[in-house]
Amino acid sequence: MRLTNEKATMQPQLSDLALVLGLLICCLPTLTWAATLSDKRLCADPKCEQIISMGIAKITYAIGGEGLISFKINSPIRVLSKSAGSNMQLWGVDINGRRGYANKDFIMEKKILVRDKDLLYEVPVVGPGSPVQSVETPVQSVETTVQPVLNASESTDDLATTTTSPLEIAVDSIVVEHDKLQDQQVPDPTAASKAQVQVIEGTELPLEAIAATTEGSIVPETAADPQEATNLDSTVVDTKEPQALNSEAIKLQEEPKAQQPATEAEKPPPLPQAINAELEDADDFDYGDDETDDDSQQGSQDNESIVEIANDNKSINESIELKPLSVAQLKKTDKVEDSKDETKEKHAEMEVSKQEDSSLPTETLNVTALEEQIDQKEFPKQVLDAAVELKSSDPLPVEEVTETVAEPPRTIVEDKINEEIVPVSAKIQAKPATVNPTEPIVAQSDAEIKAPSESVISSTTPAPVVEEAPQKADPVGLPPLFEKKNFENPNNYYKQLQEEQEKQRLVAEAEEQKRLQEEADQQKRLQEEAALNKRLLEEAEQQKRLQEEAEQQKRLQEEAELNKRLLEEAEKQKRLHEESEQLQRSSEEAEPQLSVQEANMQQLNDSVDSQSNEIVDNNNRQQPEQYQQHHHHTESAFNHPSTASHTTPTPDAESPYAAVQEETTEASQTDNHREGVGYVEPVALPATASPVSEVPIKEDAAGFGLFATIVDTVNNFIGKDPQSDPADSSDELHRILYPGRPEVPPSQRKAEDFAPADVDGYCARFQAKDEHCHRSISLDNFVEVMADKLVDHSQLLLCVVIAAISSLFFMFAYYCFCNSSQEGALLSKLNHLERSLLASHKENLIIKHDLMTTRTKLASIEDNSFGSNDMVADLKKQLESELYEKAKLQEQVGSLERDLDNAAEAGLELNKMLSEVLNGQNGDEAFMSTVDELQRQLNDQEKIIIEINNSLAEKSRENSELQYTFTEATTRLNSELKTLQEDNYELEMEKSKLQTRLQEIQAETESELAKALEARNYEMQKLQNQIVELTVKWEREHGDLQTSLAKIEALEDCLKAVGKDAIHNVQELITSAKTRGELNAVHKKLVELQSKVEQEEAHKQRLESQLQQSSQDVEQLKQDFNQSERDKLEAQTRLEVLSGYFREKENDLKKELSLQETKWLQHQGENASTVETQTLMKNEIQTLKSQNDELRAEIEAQIASHKAQMGTLENRAHESWLAARQSERRCEEALAEAASLRRKLTTMASGGGGVGGDPGVMEAIAANGTSVLGAELKTAPSPLPLPGSPLLNMPNPLPFLAAPFSPFMGLPPPFLPPTGAGGARPPPLGRMRSPPPSSRGDRDRERYSDYSDYDDYDDDEEDDRGMDRRRRHSGSWGRRHRGSYSHSPRTYRSLSPSDSRYNYNDTETDFSPPPSPPPVPSGRSATSRPYSEV
């Protein structure tokens, strides 16, 4: 018992009571069942079938408790009941064919069909452990219907989205047997438990009645109470629930069997073909939802009798035809129901639930009595039904069949049979109170009428029935379903089958009408017999009440006088044991009777085995009292024959043997008198325990079968401490084998707990052999004890041997029947066709998938979208490569910018150096080296730019190749697609041709096979005719031969007579001989005819059995057809549902397709944006190229400005040289003047001796300038530089320039020519000087330089400077060797550094790209420029 919802609501402090709660779960499993459900529900009608409102689910809800139903959000909900009772939150709902309870807060009502004020019915909700409310129910009219059972939901979420609606089948026709071993109890159908739902082909159907083939299937029913549907299954009581009732309450429930059948009219039996259809179709579809149902059904099917299956194969048509007959029996139901109380109704319903699903018949009636019933049809329909139920129910006694039947004893047997039949016939008479439920039993009895009486009576074991039962599946006279024409067009086949069955049904109806007319004549006699039986029942009830009162008084006396009665009971048991031994010896003498008893015991043993497999703990609590009561009754039956003739044992309400019903006959005789003529031995058979049991349960090897029961019985007999087990165990075999041994009453059993060991229940049964009670077993007496035990239990061993032999025989017969069955070929063919169908479905799916793929490609081709994904992928790859190239170019541009910055810094340094050189006039060589370094860097940058251009050209070429390759691949794929389409079309054509050819071959094969079968049938018919003719001829000749032989014997006799007495007339002798011969021939022929008559009778019986089997097969086929029609309707319903589902799926796919198209368009837009991005990248690359060109042009402009500065500096140097030459001439003139003055001075000095101080001379000298010469000498500049000289104030040279002349070394005088000039003359004004003399060869001659004075400082860079100088002199500054530059640098008109159009300061801070260069003139190449631009 699961407590999911109760545990969720449990308070934290209850965790300390876990042990107590576990005990409550074990002892009171039904108290917690309906914890989450309300005790009432508010409905619009008493059945809770009318839909109150329609709505949808607000949320998705999984099952949270027993009885609740799971659903998903927005699931359609039909409300069947609303809030009432203890729990106002739950509504009864129907979701997708599943019924259960749901929280009203989770339901959104959309449409209200019945207003709340119109909800007038409060229907109780009853759990499986609640007490049964018995209501005195009046007889209903024929129009009354049975209370339906709500569909129950399953506890899993798998069926929440089931879209298949349930089949519209009458709810009373659905019957499922469930194994009690699964859940220890049967839950309430309204609680949505699995036990009440039958899943047929994925559809859940409500169950009207569950007739369990168990001992515990108690089904109390009240037709007027709305709880009937819920109580029907829930009353299979879990006897773990203790009920505190006293002995008086127990006695109130002890009622005879004669009063039970009348209440059976309140609840219909299940429709048999529903079980058959379920059993046959349960495995056709493998749904995960009905795995639990299949398991439970399998457990019940294993225990189900084959006769039940055969009886279930009755048609609905016959039951409908016989329905008006049962309506006439309502009067007797009134009479019988007036004499019952509530407890009798309960037990009558318990009895019916057993009789509906009981195993094989265990009684055989008197031969002449049943022949009178069947041949003359004196008993009406209901009496025969009662006989069928008596044969198929365990609680009925076993009757012995005697072949020698006398007329007076036959009346006694009929009397006894009527005692057993009429109570059940009353049940059948009461069943017309409900319309549909009467059909199955009537149909079942109809089949019993058709059965020959010999097959019913002569068999004492059910073996023949078991052998013939499986033949119901053989098809009779129907066209083969698996022919090609029928398989391809099953509708025509079913139509043909329906027409044939309609014809057969019409013939059967005609026969049925005749038979009904004959049976209508017997109604009056039935009423008379029913009145007589009613009187008998009333007398039996009175005697039972008297006996119950006597028992109650006896129990009270036994409680007062316990010790005294124990001693009396011991003596009584000894006497009983002796009498049982005498009876056993007498039974051994009557071997036919013993064989019948053994067979009946074996059948009862089988039934006990089947019942013990299904019962878990339903009937084991009352075992001590039941055991004692049963033994007490049987003791009184054996010890007091006169009393037993009038008062038979009274059934206990709590006893599993309460089904033993005992009648009182007015023409009562002793038991010994009745044994000879159909003596009915009251054999106790198990029934279920009532809900008021109070004794604990002992599970007696339930679920382990007959072997475990036998082992348990043997252990009880030979155990050392038997008092704790045998008296309390549910040992059915012991009760069957020892019916005459009395039981100890409850008061005695309570006292036995304190009694000594030698008077306990075990030893009390064997006081005759008191020495074996507590005898210790040793090696010495082991053999003796075992021998005694074997003798004591000889009947048990005999039963075990008979059961084993019967089981082996049944298994062998079933195995032979299965091997000889004709279904193997059909099944193999069916499997082959299913495999081929599955393969065809798989091939069709594959072909359909290929076709859809091809169509998708074609549609994409038509929409010009084919290969767009590939294009996008290629474009993405191309975009990544372009982004990579862009990154490389950006890195190159960054390196170029860094180089430009370096060049700008170098220019700044050059400007500084130039300024310093110009100031000092000594940095020409360092300046030239710096200029050469910058030129070298410029050349490197040109190389890098050339490599970048080459890589760009390579990438462009690769892009063009990729585009060409893509176009070529697209064309090739289009051509391949066209080829594949053509091949596909050819394959389709070939497939259609092959299919047509295959159909033709199949048609030809079928026609040939039909012709061959027709020829074979014709030959067989011809041979049969010949055989018949030859047989007739042989019989005629054989008769003549026999006549001749008789005549010959007669003539021989006559001749012997003539030889003895010759007086007789010869003619008379001849005549007498002829007559005697004819007489002998006729006598022999009479013997042969008698043998033939016997053979024909046996053949007739066989043909009748075959006819019955054929009729059963016809009915089975009708049921199959009806089931197939239902399956067809179900399939159509499912087809509609699936069509709707696939339409919704198609709409969803269309929506998804539109989304995908939107995404595709988005991807197309992304592709377009990618192309645009690529175009932008290309434009950006072009922009970067233009920027690169602009930077290059700027560098060239800076070079040009540097050249202009160099030209300016050269001009200044030339002017300085001219000034130096002028100073040199002035110096030469001054030297010449000084020489002349020196000469004058010398002359004066040489002539100064004579003049020596002559003032005149001095004046003359002074007059000639002597004093001026002295002044000039004093004021003349010193050849050494003075501190104030500008040469000393010149700034320090740059570190990488050649050091100037040191001051201490002195500089060449400005009036001296440059060193190394070689006496060359200075150049003319405004011109460069001439090249120096070729003192160094041709190399020095070629490298004419304006600054050749410093050439010796840098000899390592002479070649580069020579190239630069050649460019300078040739006017090729900035000219590229490889045509790197496409534009000429910027030119200026003025090369003067003071020109305002060029700002030298811009090179220090301004790095913006210069304006784009002008286009290249058409007349000139891009790499040349005129000399005037320099």
Curated annotation (Swiss-Prot):
The record's region (Disordered) falls at 253-272, 284-303, 318-362, 445-524, 568-673, 1105-1126, 1312-1430
Which segments show compositional bias classed as Acidic residues? 284-296, 1348-1361
Query: Main localisation, per the record?
Result: Golgi
The SH3 domain is annotated at 50-112
Q: Where is the composition biased (Basic residues)?
A: 1364-1380
Q: Where is the composition biased (Pro residues)?
A: 1321-1334, 1408-1417
Observed effect of gene inactivation: RNAi-mediated knockdown results in basal membrane proteins such as vkg, LanB1 and Trol accumulating in the basal ER.
PTM sites of type Phosphoserine: S865, S868, S1345, S1348, S1390, S1392
Q: Where is the composition biased (Basic and acidic residues)?
A: 331-357, 497-524, 568-588, 1115-1126, 1336-1346
Compartment(s) of residence: Golgi apparatus membrane; Golgi apparatus, trans-Golgi network
- Transmembrane segments annotated in the record for this chain: 797-817
Protein's job: Required for protein secretion. May participate in cargo loading by binding to COPII coat subunits and guiding SH3-bound proteins into a growing carrier. At basal transitional ER sites in follicle epithelial cells, mediates the exit of basal membrane protein such as vkg, LanB1 and Trol, from the endoplasmic reticulum (ER) to basal Golgi clusters.
UniProt record similarity statement:
Belongs to the MIA/OTOR family. Tango1 subfamily.
Query: What is the protein name given in its UniProt record?
Result: Transport and Golgi organization protein 1
